[in-house]
A protein has these predicted regions:
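Catalytic or ion-coupling anion/metal-binding cores of large enzyme and transporter domains
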Residues: 1-179
Length: 179
């Protein structure tokens, strides 16, 4: 616009369609990747990774999550019970299957370190060499986080990976169901 290559109306149109609504962007950038991996780690309820911010389903999930916190506390499940080596390896496998942000190579080891778990780039390489990419999401593909949600979300990706033997089935989850 400043260079005079497009009109103010064209700029406004681009602004109106660039980000579909409130919430994170629609591509598999760092925010969406980490949100999906929070679910893959077992620290969020199914659906948390992909439900768009404006869907009423997001409000229902928030209510379920609040109720689930109480159940998790009653069961005595603690974050370190969930954040195990197996959980982090599952998250890396989901990351590879989704083609997530490369920033996970920084964020996941940092979270693992805080949980007392060693997660290295060698782990990423080992898991990446064995895990198929199941989704081609923006920016590397033509599909968006809403499309992943419509296709079953992180849960569907994890189910497919589990069928193929790429996940540790014994990993715990705040849903109180083993993944």
């Amino acid at each position: 616009f400043e260079a005079g290559l497009i009109s103010e109306e064209e700029l406004e149109h681009i602004e109106n369609v660039a980000c579909p609504t409130c919430g994170s962007c629609s591509g598999m950038y760092t925010a969406n990747t980490m949100n999906c991996l929070t679910e893959a780690l077992g620290m969020a309820l199914p659906g948390n990774g992909t439900i768009p911010a404006v869907y009423s389903e997001r409000l229902r999930l928030a209510k379920r999550a609040g109720m689930q916190v109480m159940e998790v506390l009653q069961e005595g499940l603690r974050p370190k019970d969930v954040l195990t080596k197996e959980a982090f390896e599952n998250a890396v496998a989901v990351d590879m299957a989704l083609g997530g942000s490369s920033n996970t190579a920084l964020h996941l080891p940092a979270i693992a370190h805080e949980a007392g778990v060693s997660l290295t780039l060698d782990d990423f390489n080992r898991i990446a060499g064995d895990t198929p990419q199941l989704a081609k999401l923006s920016p590397s593909g033509k599909y968006f986080i809403e499309d992943l949600h419509a296709a079953g979300g992180v849960y569907a990706v994890m189910h497919r990976l589990q069928e193929q033997g790429h996940l540790h089935e014994s990993a715990k989850s705040v849903s109180l169901v083993d993944q």
